[in-house]
């Protein structure tokens, strides 16, 4: 999915959520909603992003996913069975692209519910597959591609 000119919501603005938000801003996202249970984290992240991307439209303090092209769960919600959903699923459009950073299970309850609504989804382990080649290159180790890692992976949910 090309992010240029699109809208996105990132739920969870810690380290992973901050990196995702910065990547989205760098990719040309037009509108970005930041939500964290600690609103100060969202506002500090927004201030840092605004310094580098002054035309980025930012929103805070709501985890209402209505009207976003992209929705990312960057919280630990979904690591344990019975965790609450990060957003109200009734408000997620079937046209929304939904990603989750949780690695513990390939298809979290959140992703399963969004997929059942017709959303295109991206599992958390895909994030890891994209990071591994960069780590290997950084440490001057023999590298591979994210696609090759996907081919070799034996993921059990």
Annotate the PLM regions.
Residues 3-4, 87-96:
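Short, conserved loop/helix-junction motifs that constitute active-site signature segments
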Residues 5-25:
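Glycine-rich adenosine-cofactor-binding loop
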Residues 10-11, 34, 100:
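Hydrophobic Val/Ile/Leu positions in short beta-strands of Rossmann-like dinucleotide-binding domains
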Residues 26-31, 116-120:
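Conserved S-adenosyl-L-methionine
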Residues 29-52:
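NAD(P)-binding Rossmann-fold cofactor-contacting core
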Residues 54-68:
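Short acidic low-complexity segments
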Residues 75-78, 102-103:
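Short glycine-/small-residue-rich Rossmann-like dinucleotide-binding loops
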Residues 94-148, 152:
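Rossmann-fold NAD(P)-binding glycine/threonine-rich loop
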């Amino acid at each position: 999915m090309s992010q240029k000119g699109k809208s996105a919501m990132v739920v969870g603005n810690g380290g992973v959520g901050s990196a995702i938000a910065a990547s989205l801003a760098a990719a040309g996202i037009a509108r970005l909603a930041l939500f964290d249970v600690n609103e100060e984290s969202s506002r500090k992240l927004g201030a840092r992003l605004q310094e580098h991307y002054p035309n980025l439209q930012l929103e805070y303090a709501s985890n209402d996913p209505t009207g976003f092209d992209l929705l990312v769960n960057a919280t630990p919600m979904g690591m344990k069975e019975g965790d609450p959903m990060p957003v109200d699923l009734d408000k997620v459009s079937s046209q929304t692209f939904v990603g989750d950073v949780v690695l513990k299970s390939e298809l979290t309850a959140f992703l399963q519910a969004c997929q059942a609504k017709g959303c295109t989804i991206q599992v958390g382990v895909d994030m890891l597959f994209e990071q591994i080649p960069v780590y290997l290159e950084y440490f001057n180790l023999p590298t591979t591609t994210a696609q090759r890692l996907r081919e070799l992976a034996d993921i059990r949910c």
